[in-house]
Amino acid sequence: MSATPGSPRPTPLRVDVVIPVLNEAHVLEKSVTEVRAFLAANSDWDWRVVVVDNGSTDGTDRVAKMLVERHGDVQFVQLPQRGRGRALRQAWTQSDADIMSYTDVDLSTELAALPKLVNGVASGQYDLGTGSRLLPDSQTTRSFKREFISRCYNLMIKAVLWTSFSDAQCGFKVVSRRVVQEIVPNIKDQAWFFDTELLVLAEKHGYKIMDIPVRWIEDDDSRVKIVKTAWDDIKGVARLRWTLWFGTFQPASASLPVSSRAPGA
């Protein structure tokens, strides 16, 4: 939307794209370069790429610090403990952005879906958005083993937790400040189940979820131990079912940082 001549320039939407990493020195620079190029070419947001390192031992931190020195729109957060959920919680709750998001470092999910999710949340029509590998229009390339486990897991979630979203664990999500303030503090998991818990708590308490098909290509070098992760997720589902039956949920009111970014910077 163009501004009226002589009127103040509208403040651009502040968007953080978080990339959690663990021992990804070999691919981090390439991935950050791709994300930055996409954002520069496909958005008018005031964006920032936030790399969060969870205890890497391969020099990932050195690569991240080099990227920060080279690019003013890259930020680095270093944590001693592992866990994707822990990384997202730290980055999102420290953010001054209007919209927070994340993508896996392997960029398995095509970035073309990001503007649609961000715009959907920014419009106020949705509170959070997630990519899905399991909708009819999704384009997914992965092994039979991963496809089978993923479909079984998501069917289990629907059966046990009575959810309507299609894919809990796709590493491609967008959230509003409201979700970070009210939902994230209630999430118990610090690892892979964080995504599922985020979506389930949001849906069960009336937050609107945008669920869209994405193009997704499996990373052959993925560090995810899929069988162990699946077992941990099953235990997480059982815990969450118990919480929904017998626990209490109070939307938190976590205080998030006020933006220190210069308008249009």
Residue ranges of each PLM-predicted region?
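Hydrophobic helical membrane-anchoring modules
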Residues: 1-14, 158, 162-163, 186-265
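Acidic helix N-cap motif at the loop->helix transition within catalytic regions
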Residues: 26-30, 58-67
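A conserved acidic beta->alpha catalytic loop
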Residues: 53-61, 107
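Short, acidic, metal-binding catalytic loop of nucleotide-sugar glycosyltransferases
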Residues: 34-46
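N-proximal low-complexity "stem/linker" segments adjacent to membrane-targeting elements
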Residues: 1-37
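Acceptor/aglycone-binding surface of glycosyltransferases and processive sugar-polymer synthases
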Residues: 73, 79-95, 99, 111-192, ...
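Short beta-strand/loop segment that forms part of the nucleotide-sugar
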Residues: 43-56, 77-78
